Amino acid sequence: MALARVHGSEAGASFEILARYESEDTRSHAEVMGPYAQAALQDAGVRGEDLDAILTGTGPGPFTGLRAGIVTARALGFAWSVPVYGMMSLTALVERAVSGAAAGEAGAVAEEENVERAFASADLVEDAELLVLSDARRREVYSARYRVNAEGYSLVDGPNVCPASEILPGGDPSYAYGYGAGLYSEALEEHGWTIVDSARQVHPHAEYLVAAAARLGVENLSEDTSAQYLRDSDAKVPAAMLARQQKQAAQAAAQTAAQKEN
């Protein structure tokens, strides 16, 4: 979760990250989202009602975490009367790659200073193809294919879910980036993809969704917050359990909103 100040609603606006919270615990999404939101607001010294927008990743990604994030964003948006927007989660990966390669630094997210070195030997020129991948488990990857252009990048295909061995070759040059690329580097290299920074666990992070939103322009964001699951869950979640998870996320968000009012 990240809280940022974006200087303008037009495309290419500058921004600064005011607060950032993450957890590596993949089983506590519903429990931590509300407290993280409260902590971020406290760090930045703002109220929820002062926000101009809430942005949530819409996947593809793990079912439980995706539900918790979207439900929390919707609940907070309702409680604070703030518009909620959705963006494909893989956008964070392409934004991290392109912004780092272009600027030679990570800019407003400077803690990722190694981003530019990831492309030191990869000439990420205009018209290059960039494939970003995350781990979908079941020996599959979530992927999206982009083309680098003067504005940054444009989506060519995706999101998709499939074994890495089924991904079609890219153009010339073509690069693969993200944790999924490192997991299945051999299969991708057989199809002509150059693997970038495969030694590091490069995952989507909230601050790069913020960067992507600033690049696109807040006024151009999508109001569609529907989850992009792409496939059925590994285990069918009972309706009662699903309702309980959604209720927990909504309660946590409502509690955060109430605490800020007090």
Stretch-by-stretch model annotation:
Residues 24-32, 63, 67, 71, ...:
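Residues at secondary-structure transition points
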